[in-house]
A protein has these predicted regions:
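Start-transfer (signal-anchor) and selected internal transmembrane alpha helices
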Residues: 1-24, 233-234, 314-325, 395-397
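Membrane-embedded helix bundles of polyisoprenyl
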Residues: 13-16, 104-123, 128-218, 232, ...
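Membrane-interface coil-to-helix junctions
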Residues: 16-112, 140-145, 151-157, 271-275, ...
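Membrane-helix boundary/interfacial segments in multi-pass membrane proteins
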Residues: 33-36, 146-154, 264-267, 272, ...
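Periplasmic/ER-lumenal interhelical loops and adjacent helix-loop junctions
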Residues: 34-53, 232-309, 361-368
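Signature aromatic-anchored transmembrane alpha helix within multi-pass, membrane-resident enzymes
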Residues: 210, 233-238, 376, 380-409
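Hydrophobic, aromatic-rich transmembrane alpha-helices
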Residues: 294-320, 324-333, 383-384
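Extracytoplasmic
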Residues: 402-589
Length: 728
């Protein structure tokens, strides 16, 4: 009977977890939560990194330069959540990292509900009320938001009831030293595992576990029992510390330079909105953490009833202990201040924030902490009344469970989004193993990184950290919690190359080229990946970066164009650069299909983004006074043909190759695409390497200026293709 009861409870919370996350579960293999960039990428990367560090000689789990390269970051305060790594490591090879993470979500939520139910039952709360209270604890907005954000550290709220349950076992068996010793050892291991999930659980557990431990000391029958309780408590703490030293982050915590941190200001600490957030649930997936309309109203109703109609009918003094534990988390949960009648009132969290030097910055998480004691208070109060009538007990328990489920809005689908687009070229990078391939870094563009306290650039480019699991190389982009500001802040404006590649500083060609020449070989950099979709194809920035890189053929060469990504291999790379010869469309004829996928291999400055006009892929020129194209050809002479059309008024066009003019200038009309032919002598082609073709036109027109559209671009010539035909 006892086993069946536990099995039913466990299945109940498992089903509830699945219902609460049904929408992401339906898309578990392809999507993650949210409709804006969340933290999913670095939680997945964390587990890849742990496996990589454990299986690669010379690496340390708690130190890395694989993100925010070239700096080495102490990961002692990073959210590694190592407790969950074994489950991920078991599942990831079988089902992939996305599905494995969803299994962690379900496991964490189920354990949270089940352990809360165990605690309520041990505190003599009726089964039905315990199910309702534990469900309220499991289905808080903070828990569901944690699923959406992949914050598996915040999701592991089962540690709070687990620690109380374990201490209760020590107290219950205190007269049997061997049993108590075993439970103390288990508690020490549990404290260690809790710390390997998230350090803040030690802070949270102190608000519940210390008062509960004091209660058991008071309730102990003899001073010898109290002495043993203290001894076993010390033993558990010592065991935790020993394990953290030899198999955890403690040595790295002690060497961590806290002066390098950049904590957020108090005003940014996310508290529960006062007063609405204590009596309603709203904007959960917009990062608003609330208590909802069940927990606090039911607790207040129970308190009022206890002081009035139930004052003489319920004589259970222990329930007041649990109610008292609600007070401190409740006061801390709104954050640094609240607004009452237009007056700002400073709250106690301000002192706590300052005491911890801003290390704890999410006071709204105290909301989950107060639910456990609140539900025990409610359950112990009403249980005395309900146990007298089986029908009333069933009806009340059912209504409370239904109220929790309705309040949790289970059937509202959680926002989801596809994970960052997969690319085959990252897998090819990942196949490059051994010396010297293991040494290079991948530079993602736009450049962006952060620490959870400060950021350089937008969040979306940081998502490229997810690709690190595929290519397995060092990279700049990404996020490491509480990384020193010095590791990445210079990317903002101070560094000409990285600030320009992050779209925060204008291009300074000489400075950027100098830095590229030094860093490609010193860091070294193996590949530079330009994410055109993130930069934006509309506007000059994308063409500026691609065009500039194409002017440095001795340093960079395009090797992959896939989807919205253009990948440049550097001169350091052992595999070298392939020839930049356009596709041969027929024997002896090579064509650059302007506007088609892959033309990024050839285009320089002056081109606008690709377009499809009447089924033809084209680009407009005109952004610069001249427009360049870069390519290689087999040695020899060629006839160059260009398909072009002018915008708004005829244009005079001259063509140059390697700055040498070809033939006479031609006039390009506005009527339709026309073909213009030029002769390219063999002596200009030379060995065929690093050729530059320039379109030199006599002006441009902005469509908006001539009332043709709202287009603000400078348009000169529309080009469909450029062909090179053998011409002896």
């Amino acid at each position: 009977m006892r086993f069946r009861r536990h099995a039913v409870a466990l299945i109940f919370f498992l089903v509830l977890s699945i219902l609460a996350t049904y929408w992401p579960l339906f898309h578990a293999a392809t999507h993650t939560g949210g409709y804006w960039t969340t933290d999913y990428y670095h939680f997945h990367w964390n587990f890849w990194w742990v496996r990589h560090a454990l299986t690669t000689p010379g690496l340390n789990v708690y130190e890395t330069n694989f993100v925010l390269f070239p700096a080495t970051t102490n990961l002692a305060y990073h959210t590694l959540t190592l407790f969950w790594y074994p489950l991920w490591a078991l599942l990831e090879p079988l089902v992939g990292t996305l599905v494995a993470m969803n299994v962690i979500f379900i496991t964490a939520m189920t354990l949270t509900g089940y352990t809360a139910w165990l605690l309520l039952r041990r505190e003599k709360v009726l089964d039905g009320l315990a199910l309702a209270g534990a469900s309220a604890y499991m289905l808080t907005p903070a828990m569901l938001l944690s699923v959406m954000l992949t914050n598996i550290n915040y999701l592991s709220m089962f540690w709070l009831p687990v620690q109380i349950l374990l201490w209760g076992q020590i107290a219950q068996n205190i007269s049997q030293s061997k049993k108590a010793l075993i439970w103390a050892i288990i508690q020490g291991c549990a404290l260690y595992a809790m710390m390997m999930t998230d350090y803040t659980f030690l802070l949270f557990s102190a608000f519940l576990l210390i008062p509960y431990a004091l209660l058991t000391l008071i309730e102990a029958r003899a001073w010898s029992d109290r002495a043993r309780l203290v001894a076993f408590g010390v033993l558990a703490l010592v065991l935790m510390v020993v394990l953290l030293w030899f198999a955890g982050p403690l040595p790295h915590i002690l060497t961590f330079d806290r002066s390098s941190l950049s904590p957020q200001p108090l005003k940014d600490a996310q508290g529960i909105p006062f007063p609405d957030g204590y009596f309603s649930r709203f904007a959960t997936y917009d990062r608003k953490v609330t208590l909802g309309w069940f927990v606090l109203p039911v607790t207040l109703l129970t308190l009022i009833a206890s002081l009035t109609v139930l004052r003489r009918r319920v004589r259970n003094s222990r329930r007041w202990f649990w109610l008292a534990l609600v007070i401190v988390p409740l006061i801390l949960s709104p954050g640094g201040s609240i607004l009452i009648a237009g007056s700002e009132i400073t709250m106690p969290f301000t002192a706590m924030f300052n005491l911890l030097n801003g290390m704890f910055r999410v006071p709204s998480r105290f909301g989950g902490l107060l639910i456990l004691p609140a539900m025990i208070f409610v359950g112990r109060t009403w249980g005395v009344i309900l146990m007298r009538s089986r029908e009333l007990k069933i009806a009340t328990s059912t209504l409370m469970i239904l109220a929790v489920l309705v309040e949790a809005q289970l059937f509202a689908p959680m926002p989801i989004q596809p994970v960052t687009q997969p690319y085959d070229f990252y897998a090819k990078m990942g196949q490059e193993h051994g010396e010297p391939y293991d040494d290079y870094a991948v530079l993602e563009v736009p450049v962006a990184g952060g620490s959870g306290e400060a950021w350089v650039g937008e969040f979306r480019p940081m998502e490229t950290q997810f690709y690190g699991m595929t290519h397995g190389k060092r990279m700049l982009n990404g996020s490491l919690a509480r990384a020193p500001l010095v590791n990445f802040w210079y990317w903002l404006y101070d560094d000409p190359m990285l600030a320009w590649l992050g779209q925060r500083r204008y291009l300074e060609p000489e400075n950027v080229e100098s830095q590229l020449r030094e860093r490609i070989f010193a860091w070294p950099i193996g590949y530079i990946v330009i994410h055109q979709d993130t930069i934006g194809r509309v506007g000059p920035t994308n063409q500026e970066i691609v065009g500039y890189f194409n002017t440095l053929p001795d340093l960079l060469c395009p090797v992959f164009v896939e989807g919205d990504a253009v990948v440049y291999r550097t001169a350091w790379h052992p595999d070298g650069c392939p020839d930049r010869i356009p596709p041969e469309i027929e024997p002896g004829t090579y064509q650059i299909d302007i506007g088609s996928i892959g033309d990024e291999n050839f285009i320089g400055w002056g081109w606008h983004g690709p377009e499809n006009i009447a089924g033809i892929s084209v680009r407009w020129s005109g952004e610069y006074p001249q427009t360049q194209t870069y390519f290689d050809l087999p040695p020899g002479g060629y006839e160059i043909s260009i398909s072009a059309q002018a915008f708004h008024e005829p244009r005079t066009l001259r063509v140059l190759v390697n700055d040498s003019p070809l033939d006479e200038a031609v006039t390009v009309s506005t009527e339709s695409l026309q073909t213009f032919t030029f002769t390219l002598p063999a002596e200009i082609v030379g060995d065929g390497k690093h050729l530059k073709l320039t379109l030199d036109y006599d002006g441009w027109v902005v469509p908006n200026d001539v009332n043709q559209s709202g287009d603000m671009r400078k348009l000169a010539l529309m080009v469909d293709w450029i062909r090179f035909k053998d011409h002896p």
